[in-house]
């Protein structure tokens, strides 16, 4: 599948929530940890899209981790270690159990840090993790524009 060109500068703020429109696959430890044709994605100015899969499409074992974070748009997130096949990734997935009303459709959907998985794909296209160690977006080759997260971009 060929993904359409998207300019991250055109993504909205506050962020938007929409169907991913493509099959999303997460691999870990030689196994498919999650796979969905019903994934959602969050789009925000200068960010790579963040993909969220329905819990029933996640085959991996999720082990709760201590600590929470708060997003001004989506609410409080909780984190999980992920175990699939022969692999285990620490604090590699998160969800919003009770998101803000605008993002209600995300409730309990799981997102994965691409850099902690063996591979993540959107529409058969392998992704790269969003730069930095904070954001969980997935970079695909169809994205143009500067993506926040790398050195010197944290403050804008």
Predicted feature residues:
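Terminal leader/tail segments of proteins
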Residues: 1-156
